[in-house]
Amino acid sequence: MNFSSIGNLGCLRSFLQNECNWFSVCKKKLYHEYRCVATSSPVFAVDKFKDCLHCNIIILKKNLDFVFSLAINGIHAGQFATNSIKLKKIIITNDLVYYILELGSLTVTDLHFIPKYNSEHVLNVRPITPNLIYDTCSIVSYDEAKLLTVKGPGENKLIPLGCGSWCLNNMGRYYVYTFVLVYDLYLACFEKNTLPSLSKVVFDMISCNNKHCVFCKDHSKHVEQTGKTVGCTDNQETCFCYTPCKKKMAKISNQDLSSLLCDQELDLLDLIYPEKPTSLSTDINAYVHGHKNQEPVVLRNTNWILIRLDPAISRLILLSCPVCKRIVSR
């Protein structure tokens, strides 16, 4: 890999800081090692490492500067010097801790030796589960919601994800807002690894069966959110990228989920995207309409709550998905 140009070094620095969640591998007196498993990057494009970038970084102090060695997918990528390295510690629980890397300007250097990377190290960290999301989220009040903009200008403009899910990018700090089933219904109706967001439920109701559909087919390009496994995985059951191909008067193919939206069986769903400037609503009827025999049906909003995810969890989820990562970082 050629990192000799300023542009390439800038892309590398941006990738390491903004697209990687770093987990500690070991901390020794002379060096620290961290690991990240990242999905494909929109800025750091390397043909050999297209869909998954498993990165190991070994940081050493040298005089007044810092030097680090980088390996990507088990291949030594280079050594770099910088006058500043900060690792911001993010604590979600005692068994789920990660770091965000902050770097000064980079230059290529050579230590005249290649350190041994712990590429096979298995991280002992807690996974992102629906229970963890419910435990750490905040319920969004009407007053908070009206300060957030779904359509139109505004400081707190939300970025749309799947149906009923959005992201607020506050200077690189991500907050996911989403409708989810009330906790009791989640326990009664869903497996423990599936977050019953409105995005996921609506997708499962109306997605098509065409294996070539770029919207409804599982693209299997996610990575595990806490870096425990290396390589791409199927769509995460806690992600918010679920977007069906048909959004207007879509036929319901999975009636088992209709009862979560309404007391009666529905024929069609209509996904609503506001056309006029408006703030965020706490009512699911603002974003999805149901129909029975061509007649509109009011959906049961009491089954749902609008929540704000912890920003530390939001970052782990969004950066593990190549679609969400590109949407929120624009």
Curated annotation (Swiss-Prot):
Q: Which compartment or compartments is the protein found in?
A: Virion tegument; Host cytoplasm; Host nucleus
Does the record bear Nucleotide-binding in its keywords? no
Major place of localization? virion
UniProt GO cellular component terms: host cell cytoplasm; host cell nucleus; viral tegument
Taxonomy, superkingdom: Viruses
Q: Which UniProt keywords apply?
A: Host cytoplasm, Host nucleus, Late protein, Virion, Virion tegument
**InterPro entries referenced in this protein's UniProt entry, alphabetically:** Herpes_UL16/UL94 (IPR004286)
Task of the protein: Plays a critical role in cytoplasmic virus egress. Participates in the final step of tegumentation and envelope acquisition within the host cytoplasm by directly interacting with the capsid. Upon virion binding to target cell, a signaling cascade is triggered to disrupt the interaction with the capsid, thereby preparing capsid uncoating.
- Quaternary structure? Interacts with cytoplasmic envelopment protein 3 and with the capsid.
Question: Family, per the entry?
Answer: Belongs to the herpesviridae cytoplasmic envelopment protein 2 family.
Name of this chain's protein: Cytoplasmic envelopment protein 2
Recorded source organism is Human herpesvirus 7 (strain JI)
